[in-house]
Design a protein with these regions (language model features):
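Intrinsically disordered, low-complexity, charged terminal extensions of DNA damage-control enzymes
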Residues: 98-185
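Catalytic cores of DNA base-excision repair glycosylases
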Residues: 1-130, 183
Length: 185
């Protein structure tokens, strides 16, 4: 799916932007598959614009820095935007992402190696291991599926294409259906 989306975005860049990736964060966000994080990362790293790039690592760093148990996306973007400097914003965003990936890790944060530990409210409160509060796990659905393997006399197999907008969108599979509880396939 990412490859399809990337291809669609490349087509839009070619057709609407003369083959040049737009530098405006809002124009970037209008590209297929480009959300706030990707637009902020591209704008700051490639174009030097002071835009926040909040990924999971940055979320964790900011949650701990401000000792926030469950910050919302808008609050995190606001906090990140306040920190991003006008000079070298891409380097700053990359450093914050790297800090979250290597030092301020989800489990066993290495506060003794953190360059911003003296500013960290969660460390001061002893709550760094609890920040941000983990999201509850999603229940994984379990379905029984009846599948048919249809072989033609010439050895060809019957395959059907999955819907574009679902799980494994656009890929091919043997024909089948979810079987209701108690039914035989």
């Amino acid at each position: 799916r990412r490859a399809h989306t990337l291809h669609r975005a490349a087509r839009v860049v070619r057709e609407r932007h003369g083959g040049r990736i737009p530098g405006d964060p809002e124009a970037l966000r209008r590209l297929p598959g480009v959300g706030r994080y990707t637009a902020g990362a591209i704008a700051s790293i490639a174009f030097g614009l002071p835009e926040p790039a909040v990924d999971g690592n940055v979320r964790r760093v900011l949650s701990r820095l401000h000792d926030l148990p469950d910050p919302g996306a808008a609050e995190l973007r606001r906090l990140a935007a306040e920190l991003v400097p006008a000079e070298r914003p891409g380097d700053f965003n990359q450093a914050l992402m790297e800090l979250g990936a290597t030092v301020c890790t989800p489990r066993s944060p290495r506060c003794d190696r953190c360059p911003i530990a003296s500013y960290c409210r969660a460390r001061a409160a002893g709550t760094q291991a609890e920040r941000p509060r983990p999201k509850p796990s999603k229940a994984i659905p379990e379905d029984d599926v009846g599948t048919a393997i249809v072989l033609a006399p010439d050895g060809a197999l019957l395959l059907v294409r999955r819907p574009e907008d679902g799980l494994l969108g656009g890929l091919w599979e043997f024909p089948g259906e979810v079987v209701a509880a108690g039914e035989m396939p």
